[in-house]
A protein has these predicted regions:
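Flexible, low-complexity coil/linker segments
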Residues: 151-223, 347-398
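Beta-strand-rich ligand-recognition modules
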Residues: 30-49, 53-74, 78-83, 87, ...
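Extended extracellular/luminal ectodomain segments enriched in beta-structured repeat modules
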Residues: 82-91, 216-224, 235, 405
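Secretory targeting and sorting signals
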Residues: 1-29
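Feature for soluble, non-membrane regions of globular proteins
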Residues: 90, 207-208, 215, 238, ...
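A short secondary-structure junction signal
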Residues: 204, 209-211, 233-241
Length: 546
């Protein structure tokens, strides 16, 4: 079957950053119906809820809008007078509701040009759903200290067929107190922080990356970049991991196949590489019944790709404007569909007005991207890809010379098979993104692995079935002189199996489906293990325990 047919359930898309409340921690079992009805459980994830510090807090409404088209909400932000800071934590919360019929839609929110939220929406039931998302935005404290312009957009289409209006409210809650120190120097998902002079979790400055050159403070001693990289917004880049070279008879083409790599450069020189996360949106794999209650990993939490650019700080500290640019390797020339808004997070040396140093090492391997097509029944595309980059530099700070070395290694393998007409379409894929950051005697090693294993089939009876497994894993170890190694492990998995009658009105689909969402996190401070299971839109298990 043509990709346009089999993927017709996924049109425009979007993404959300944050954690949905997981609900009750006790096991729970409701009796599911024989098939999906006109209503189902509100969207929920197994992600851990955010902790909130005790003490005084203040709430500010950041945006409130009903999105019917592509008109952005524009407003203004003023810091809370009753909670002037410092802030131990700032929590963004999005509350949404929608009913009727609608696709999943892509959205983002900026304050003074700094993107602090990227989000997508769930698909509604005819009777209506509500959902809530929370995100820790403490790292944007520099932006939130000052009044600024707010812009939010969740592009939507409302007409006689697609009736769902997206009603959204976004708030910020400011918890007063001193922010905690960061757990380590790596960019593996925790709050930033490191030994010696930059053990502060919250950066001193946050600068949006735009088309214009950027000028950084001359006493910058640590520099991260974050990129909210999403392949979405229509066209085949919404499911880039399924694209094939031009020679293969498949409906989604990309001359170089499915390998993608998010790159950041400074003044035209490669400064960082990363594997994009293969997000499956809430209409993905031709089957919205997989996602109505439990979205896949990160589908409601667009986490930015993060780079440690500290080796380049000496070059940027000259007081002159510099070009910082983001690109996605593997995207066909002229092809749209990727969004890569980026921010720079900077820590300053408060003991020195100017920090000098040098970039001392820049070494990369030749990028590998080898898609091999084999004709037959089924057709098959085997792809391998990879790249490695090492950069090193030093800074002469007020607390001595500090050398930072960053090594990033990417590896990808996938096997994509499909039949003529694409009535059967299957993919098994793995992305590895390994990073080592050494600075001031502290080494942080992070091994990230993302997996996808799924198959969609369309039978002679027009029953469309999707069986899919997704994995999001990260293993981070911090080595400090004279101390035991500190390890953090994340293992977030999703499995689903859903079937419905294709090409008929919604009330004739006779859909059935089961899903399991399990989030496991083990840190030096303890563990978290939460499992959600659904059947036909009913939550049949909600259990926690390590």
């Amino acid at each position: 079957m043509r990709r346009q047919r089999i993927m017709s359930m996924i049109s425009g898309l979007a993404l959300v950053a944050g954690s949905l409340f997981a609900g009750a921690s006790l096991a729970r079992a409701d009796t599911p119906p024989a098939e999906f009805g006109t209503d189902w459980h509100d969207p929920i994830t197994a992600d851990p809820p955010l902790t909130r510090p005790a003490g005084r807090s203040c709430e500010v409404t950041l945006a409130a809008a009903q999105f019917r088209d592509f008109t952005p909400y524009r407003g203004s932000y003023t810091p809370p007078e009753a909670c002037p800071g410092p802030w131990a934590k700032v929590v963004l919360r999005l509350d949404g509701k929608v009913k009727g019929r609608q696709y999943d839609r892509l959205g983002n929110l900026t304050v003074d040009g700094v993107e602090i939220l990227r989000t997508s929406t769930p698909q509604p039931s005819p009777d209506g759903i509500t959902w809530s998302v929370e995100k820790d935005v403490t790292r944007y404290t520099d932006t939130l200290r000052r009044p600024g312009a707010v812009e939010m957009l969740i592009g939507n289409v409302v007409n006689d067929t697609y009736t769902g209006v997206l009603d959204v409210r976004v708030t910020l809650t400011f918890h007063t107190g001193r922010p905690a120190a960061g757990p380590g120097r790596g960019t593996g998902g925790g709050a930033p922080g490191t030994a010696r002079g930059t053990d502060r979790a919250v950066p001193d400055r946050v600068l949006p990356v735009t088309a214009a050159p950027v000028t950084t403070p001359r006493n910058t001693e640590r520099l991260l970049a974050e990129v909210y990289a999403t392949g979405s917004g229509g066209g085949c880049e919404e499911y880039w991991y399924l694209t094939v070279p031009d020679a293969a008879p498949y409906s989604c083409k990309a001359a170089e196949g499915p390998y993608r790599e998010v790159r950041i450069s400074v003044d035209g020189r490669l400064a960082g590489i990363a594997a994009p996360f293969p997000t499956v949106w809430t209409g993905g794999w031709s089957n919205p019944f997989l996602w109505y209650v439990t979205p896949g990993p990160r589908a409601f939490d667009v986490q930015p790709v993060t780079y440690d650019l500290t080796p380049f700080a000496a070059l940027l500290n000259d007081g002159r404007p510099h070009a910082v640019e983001v690109s996605v390797a593997g995207v066909p020339a002229g092809q749209s569909g990727w969004s890569v808004p980026a921010n720079l997070l900077l820590w300053q040396d408060h003991g020195r007005r100017t920090v000098t140093g040098a970039l001392t090492r820049h070494q990369q391997t030749e990028p590998v991207n080898t898609p091999r097509y084999t004709a037959g029944s089924p057709h098959r595309l085997d792809t391998t890809g990879g790249h490695s980059l090492t950069v090193s530099g030093y800074l002469d700070t007020s607390h001595g010379r500090v050398t930072t070395t960053v090594t990033r290694t990417l590896a990808h393998t996938s096997a994509h098979t499909w039949t003529d007409g694409e009535d059967r379409d299957a993919l098994t894929a793995e992305w590895r993104d390994d990073e080592t950051v050494t600075t001031g005697g502290v080494t942080t090693r992070t091994a990230r692995t993302h997996t996808m294993d799924g198959e969609t089939t369309l039978g002679a009876d027009s029953r469309l079935r999707t069986v899919l497994g997704l994995g999001d894993r990260a293993d981070t170890t911090v080595y400090r002189p004279g101390r035991p190694a500190s390890r953090t492990r994340l293992d977030h998995t999703y499995t689903g199996d859903a079937t419905y009658t294709y090409g008929v009105p919604r009330d004739q689909r006779h859909a059935v489906g089961t899903t399991t969402d399990r989030y496991r996190l083990r840190t030096p401070d303890g563990c978290y293990d939460h499992t959600l299971r659904t059947a036909q839109g009913v939550l049949v298990e909600d259990s926690s325990g390590c």
